[in-house]
Amino acid sequence: PQEEALSYLDAISSHCDYKKDSKDIVEAAASEYCEKQRKVKAGFDFPSFCYAMATGIGKTRLMGASIYYLYKTKGYKHFFILAPGNTIYEKLRKESNPNHPKYIFKGLEAEMGKPKVYDGENYDTYPIKYDQMSLIVEKTSDIQLFIFNIGKIFNSKTDTQFNFHKFKETLGASFADVLAQFDDLVICMDEAHRYYAPASMKAINYLKPVLGLEFTATPKSTSNVIYAYDLARGAVEGYLK
């Protein structure tokens, strides 16, 4: 199923340029080349595609494969990975370490090198500089992953903004402003149905990614699903017990 899922991203990506094309053009390509031709429409300000995959099929592996694909075919190097809570956040942090047995890019090390990982604990060490008060983000040859836990950085009861939208003295800017500088930022949302509250969507839209990839077994809406693989099919085909 992961290979099949990736084939739809490939078909869509081959017919549009996420950096240059408008959201409407990208969604028109997605509507034509998704699994079951349908009108694809994302709720965010940017094009965002959902993989509706049953739990246990390997969404994290698919995320790693999608990142590799966009790096290899489009040259994108900046990937923002959002986790819905501490358990998944810690799991993603561990699995982004090449020494972990379930390394997210297992088997792709020779092609990808070692991606630099920034997360909720070390993001204020990100290297930036200023030129006449303008924020300059250094060009990088490495893939950079930014792994954040929405529960940790955003508290809807007390906070109207993500913590990384706040000014950081060490950076001289907010980390959201740093992320918004990248012209190739892709946002990967694990358990994507958790991010559709208005405040979360506003904070995510602020980052201006070129593309969103959503991974969930229970999509908030089916309007942007490009590939679906449910429990029943997984059981029949032997991927789930």
Q: Which residues does each predicted region cover?
A:
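RecA-like P-loop NTPase motor core of helicase/translocase proteins
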Residues: 1-241
